[in-house]
């Protein structure tokens, strides 16, 4: 999967100058696995936003892990944590960027979780456990991406 996504990203980057790419999904790999770190993000033009996050999107036994990920083109990544204040847009303007990643998070709303009687703590509230309907939502927690999208006309007038 990582190789197919890499070829697709390369193709888009050849026909478009600085495209805004968002790749999202359950990769069945951790951000640190070779398929994501080397194959998909190895050129440095794509960034895995989930890398370094503390809590996971799914839980196997007592361990949280991150299989659900957002990978974006580097030109969407903010230069620093103050990049969204008005006076910090000048640097981005030179790069003709108008879409930024403002925030990424794993949604951990209480209704998405249940107590884990076997291993302690909490785990995602599943829809099914085998063939048995549990009434929950998923065995993975959802992830959310907050983007700052600037209209070019509005963007360049500042």
Task: Name every feature range the model reports, one short phrase each.
Residues 7-21, 28-158:
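Metal-dependent phosphoester-hydrolase catalytic domains
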């Amino acid at each position: 999967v990582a190789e197919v996504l890499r070829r697709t990203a390369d193709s888009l980057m050849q026909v478009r100058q600085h495209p805004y790419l968002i790749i999202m999904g359950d990769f069945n790999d951790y951000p640190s696995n070779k398929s994501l770190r080397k194959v998909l993000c190895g050129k440095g033009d794509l960034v895995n936003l989930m890398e370094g996050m503390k809590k996971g999107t799914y839980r196997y036994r007592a361990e949280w892990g991150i299989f659900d990920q957002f990978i974006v083109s580097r030109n969407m990544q903010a230069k620093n944590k103050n990049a969204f204040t008005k006076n910090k847009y000048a640097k981005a303007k030179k790069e003709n960027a108008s879409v930024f990643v403002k925030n990424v998070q794993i949604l951990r709303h209480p209704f998405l979780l249940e107590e884990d009687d076997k291993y302690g703590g909490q785990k995602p509230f599943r829809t099914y456990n085998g063939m048995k309907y549990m009434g929950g939502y998923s065995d993975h927690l959802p992830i959310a991406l907050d983007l700052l999208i600037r209209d070019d006309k509005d963007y360049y007038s500042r």
